[in-house]
């Protein structure tokens, strides 16, 4: 039945049968002893009623709005607009799906139950509009190995979300897979702090995730990875950083990730991989690297990477890698380039660059002073311009007068006679 509960063999049915059997026996005893039947029933009935009513919640009951399968050890509460984690989850649950809800906040001890959810191994909370995960939210889940928080706008992820409310005394987390794809919140909800830093703090707190084998951080608009972030995750086998905005891996060290098998760096903003990164990747024995759809800049700085690509086998689909810049190299396949193709525009020595910068500053100051002088003397300059204009006008009028006399012979003779 949609949205209903599909339960396995119910322990509650057994208890109900026992209660009915007790009532039948009580009735038989009452009928065999009529004088004491009324008093026996009146004294025993309250006890039986209280015994039945005092039974604790059945450990295999299915929460409202959820679907349960004891055989598969699975509970699904999907797209039910739940605002909190159900409190009556069955103790047998091993796989719990709480996707597509309206949880908003995951408080400390959100999954603490009596009896505890000791078998819960896989927890999926994706797409539940979580914007805050508090310290100790996943405490009391000793078997939790896979956690999916994808597609939640996590504006506030506590540093102790995965390590417990007190990382200094908490045991290592049992998590093996942590999926945090597309958890970046809107810009106006980031509380004026680095989103990358918030996520990394949660990953590294108390060194609780040293057993983590799979980490997915795709589609989070990461611009960089903080220094040594991966050094404290030595058990990683699969790392997904695809579809971010990473421009460089200069400060990221892969040296300690000796078990790393796959590294996804597709769809980032990488321009070149430098020698240090190339050497570390080449030193990992089982690594497969994915580098598709990055804007590679094919200039003289790309020479070492091109040489490495031609020799290594760790890069998957390396024949698909193409240049994005400069314009003359666009869509050229990296494996087809040689050293003659990779050149850089001449670069001025640093000392000469400094001289030109200083000269530009001096000229700018001189120009500013000149404009200030002109502004302060604007009235005098205006008067001087009027005088120049009047002088030019008088000069031109005299010129036109002489020209008219010279052009008319009668005026010329008249002028000569008047001179005589």
From Swiss-Prot:
The keyword Membrane applies. It comes from Homo sapiens (Human). Antigen 5T4 is overexpressed by a wide spectrum of cancers, including colorectal, ovarian and gastric, but with a limited normal tissue expression. Could be used for tumor immunotherapy. Reduction of TPBG levels by siRNA significantly enhanced the beta-catenin/TCF transcription-based reporter pBAR activation in response to Wnt stimulation. Changing residue 97 to T: Strongly reduces Wnt inhibitory function. Disulfide bonds join 62-68, 66-77, 298-323, 300-344. Residues 32-355 are extracellular. The C-terminus of LRR N-terminal cap (LRRNT) and LRR 1 are essential for the inhibition of the Wnt signaling pathway. LRR repeats lie at residues 92-113, 116-139, 141-163, 172-204, 209-232, 233-255, 256-275. This is Trophoblast glycoprotein. Residues 283-346 form the LRRCT domain. Residues 53-91 form the LRRNT domain. Keywords: Cell membrane, Disulfide bond, Glycoprotein, Leucine-rich repeat, Membrane, Phosphoprotein, Repeat, Signal, Transmembrane, Transmembrane helix. Residues 377-420 are cytoplasmic. It is found in: Cell membrane. It is a single-pass type I membrane protein. The lineage of its organism: Eukaryota, Metazoa, Chordata, Craniata, Vertebrata. The modification Phosphoserine is found at residue 418. One of its GO terms (biological process) is positive regulation of phosphatidylinositol 3-kinase/protein kinase B signal transduction. Changing residue 124 to Q: Impaired trafficking to the cell surface.
């Amino acid at each position: 039945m949609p949205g209903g509960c599909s339960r396995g063999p119910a322990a509650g049915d057994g208890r109900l049968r026992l209660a009915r059997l007790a009532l039948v026996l009580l009735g038989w005893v009452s009928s065999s002893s009529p004088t004491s039947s009324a008093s026996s029933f009146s004294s025993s009935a309250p006890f039986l009623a209280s015994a039945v009513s005092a039974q604790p919640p059945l450990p295999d009951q299915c929460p409202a709005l959820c679907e349960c399968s004891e055989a598969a050890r699975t509970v699904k509460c999907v797209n039910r607009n739940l605002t909190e984690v159900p409190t009556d989850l069955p103790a047998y649950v091993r796989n719990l799906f709480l996707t597509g809800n309206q949880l908003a906040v995951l408080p400390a001890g959100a999954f603490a139950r009596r009896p505890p959810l000791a078998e819960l191994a896989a927890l999926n909370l994706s797409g539940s509009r979580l914007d805050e995960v508090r310290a100790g939210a996943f405490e009391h889940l000793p078997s939790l190995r896979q956690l999916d928080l994808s597609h939640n706008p996590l504006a506030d992820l506590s540093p102790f979300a995965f390590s417990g409310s007190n990382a200094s005394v908490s045991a290592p987390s049992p998590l093996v897979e942590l999926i945090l794809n597309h958890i970046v919140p809107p810009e106006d909800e980031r509380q004026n702090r680095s989103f990358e830093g918030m996520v990394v703090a949660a990953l590294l707190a108390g060194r609780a995730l040293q057993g983590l084998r799979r980490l997915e951080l795709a589609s989070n608009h990461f611009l960089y990875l903080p220094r040594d972030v991966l050094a404290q995750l030595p058990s990683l086998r699969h790392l997904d950083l695809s579809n971010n905005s990473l421009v460089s891996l200069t400060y990221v060290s892969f040296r300690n990730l000796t078990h790393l098998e796959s590294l996804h760096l597709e769809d980032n903003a990488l321009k070149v991989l430098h020698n240090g990164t190339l050497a570390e990747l080449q030193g990992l024995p089982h690594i497969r690297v994915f580098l598709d759809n990055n804007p590679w800049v094919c200039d003289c700085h790309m020479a070492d990477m091109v040489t490495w690509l031609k020799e290594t086998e760790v890069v998957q689909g390396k024949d698909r890698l193409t240049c994005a810049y400069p314009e003359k190299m666009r869509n050229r396949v990296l494996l087809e380039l040689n050293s003659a193709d990779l050149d850089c525009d001449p670069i001025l020595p640093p000392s000469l660059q400094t001289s030109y910068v200083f000269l530009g500053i001096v000229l700018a100051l001189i120009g500013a002073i000149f404009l200030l002088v002109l502004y302060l003397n604007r009235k005098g300059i205006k008067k001087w311009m009027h005088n120049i204009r009047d002088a030019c006008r008088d000069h031109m009028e005299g010129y036109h007068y002489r020209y008219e006399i010279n052009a008319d012979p009668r005026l010329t003779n008249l002028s000569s006679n008047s001179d005589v």
